[in-house]
């Protein structure tokens, strides 16, 4: 979803705001910069950001990945370093606080002309809150931290958002679906408008 959506976002921003660059705020338990893997298609959920970078839609320095944890293979980490991707691990979030992390991102971009796209992989949230995803991970964000991050990100020029990796069929309680809906509702209720004047 993110690969196609962001390509459309990129084209729309470049057409309407040619003076602006584009960036992504990426909430995820994983880096999603893998290369080829077994018999996976050319674009799959594990390589989305590598493809966007390699296909010329995204500068690695404008990608902010928030919440990765667990095993990070050396070749993926080397790719992150090579492309200048901004990485904020789950452990860093626990030590610094999500609001401080987001404020760091805002500070880095305060003098730049960038329209941001938020992509929220639901497995960024801790597995004790989210059951309806194919790759749950412990030690993730709480729903409160996610909501606080969205509230704080309003200081940036955010013009688009998606929520991915949600599979309600894996959660009989439907709590994962409700949580995802709440996050999207809060995003809309906060009145994000890409920095446009009301």
Regions found by a protein language model. Give the residues of each.
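Conserved alpha-helical scaffold segments that buttress catalytic/binding sites
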Residues: 1-198
């Amino acid at each position: 979803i993110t690969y196609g959506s962001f390509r459309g976002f990129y084209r729309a921003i470049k057409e309407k705001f040619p003076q602006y660059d584009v960036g992504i705020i990426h909430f995820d338990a994983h880096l999603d910069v893998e290369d080829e893997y077994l018999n996976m298609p050319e674009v799959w959920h594990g390589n989305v950001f590598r493809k966007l970078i390699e296909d010329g839609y995204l500068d690695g320095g404008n990608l902010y990945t928030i919440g990765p944890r667990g095993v990070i293979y050396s070749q993926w980490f080397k790719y992150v370093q090579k492309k200048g991707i901004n990485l904020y691990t789950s452990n860093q979030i626990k030590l610094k606080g999500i609001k401080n992390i987001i404020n760091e991102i805002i500070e880095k971009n305060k003098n730049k002309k960038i329209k941001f796209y938020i992509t929220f992989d639901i497995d960024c949230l801790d597995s004790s809150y989210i059951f309806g995803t194919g790759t749950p991970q412990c030690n993730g964000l709480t729903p409160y931290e996610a909501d606080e991050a969205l509230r704080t990100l309003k200081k940036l020029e955010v013009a688009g958002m998606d929520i991915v990796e949600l599979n309600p069929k894996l959660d009989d309680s439907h709590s994962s679906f409700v949580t995802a809906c709440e996050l999207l509702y809060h995003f809309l209720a906060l009145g994000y408008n890409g920095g446009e004047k009301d």
